[in-house]
């Protein structure tokens, strides 16, 4: 069924809950710590390509890692008058592996002045618990599964939810949903990808898909154009 009716509007067509993930825009390659800012190019792309795509998708809920660079990525979208909301800062979307000598435990006061943040939002996971569940990729997958399940229960049909986070979390979510190994993925910075959240829940309760192919890094071919583009995968059959 088409998402829209023949008149170009949504009509009476039912719109299901959709979730998207975005990896933050470009940062300095040698500094993944909490307070590092996007590069000049990353800031510009956040104000142009990312902004345009989020407007096109009609995102109406944003959950963000507390890291400065992630909030910078979604800020141009959130500061628009028609959006009318802030980012829900969520510690379970934090960076992995831990890049800070001392893991952060609270949002700096200046972030509330610099970014549109929902001050009344209570995070699904405290900073302390997120840090405890940051030792390996299995812990990251577990905390992300639990969060996606919560979102699937608290959001309504028609909602368009964005999870703004980091490379490892983006790859972990897409891997759980698709069965494609994390090592085969290289989602570009600033890229928005739709998440099959049903697939994530199936992974949590029944284990992930078991695709009948061998996969190498070269199989994952991102295509990031100014207007977004598609993510494309190529596969080699097992034994081929």
Which residues are covered by each model-predicted region?
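Alpha-helical packing segments of well-folded alpha/beta enzyme cores
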Residues: 45-50, 70-73, 136, 140-151
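Active-site-proximal alpha-helix that buttresses catalytic centers in soluble enzyme cores
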Residues: 10-85, 190
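Glycine-rich phosphate-binding loop signature in dinucleotide/nucleotide-binding domains
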Residues: 55-58, 151-160
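Active-site catalytic microenvironments for nucleophilic, acid-base chemistry
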Residues: 76, 80, 150, 154, ...
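Acidic, low-complexity terminal tails and accessory targeting/binding regions
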Residues: 2-18, 83, 95-113, 157-159, ...
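Short, active-site-adjacent cap segments at secondary-structure transitions
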Residues: 28, 69-71, 95-97, 169-171
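Phosphate-handling substructures
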Residues: 36-37, 79-145, 186, 204-206, ...
């Amino acid at each position: 069924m088409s998402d829209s009716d023949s008149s170009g509007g949504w009509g009476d067509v039912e719109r299901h809950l959709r979730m998207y993930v975005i990896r933050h825009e470009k940062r300095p390659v040698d500094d993944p710590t909490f307070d590092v800012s996007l590069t000049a190019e990353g800031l510009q792309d956040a104000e142009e390509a990312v902004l345009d795509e989020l407007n096109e998708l009609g995102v109406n809920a944003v959950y963000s890692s507390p890291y400065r660079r992630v909030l910078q990525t979604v800020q141009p979208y959130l500061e628009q008058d028609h959006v009318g909301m802030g980012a829900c800062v969520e510690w379970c979307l934090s960076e992995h592996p831990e890049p800070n000598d001392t893991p952060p435990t609270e949002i700096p006061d200046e972030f509330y002045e610099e970014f549109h943040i929902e001050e009344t939002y209570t995070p699904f996971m405290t900073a302390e618990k997120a840090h405890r569940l940051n030792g390996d990729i299995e812990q990251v997958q577990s905390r992300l599964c639990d969060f996606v399940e919560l979102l699937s229960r608290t959001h309504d049909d028609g909602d368009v939810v964005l999870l703004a986070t980091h490379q490892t979390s983006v790859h972990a979510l897409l891997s759980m949903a698709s069965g494609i190994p994390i090592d085969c993925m290289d989602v570009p910075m600033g890229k928005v990808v739709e998440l099959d959240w049903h697939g994530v829940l199936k992974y949590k309760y029944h284990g992930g898909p078991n695709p009948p192919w061998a996969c190498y890094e070269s199989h994952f071919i991102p295509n990031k154009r100014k207007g977004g583009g598609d993510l494309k995968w190529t596969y080699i059959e097992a034994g081929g």
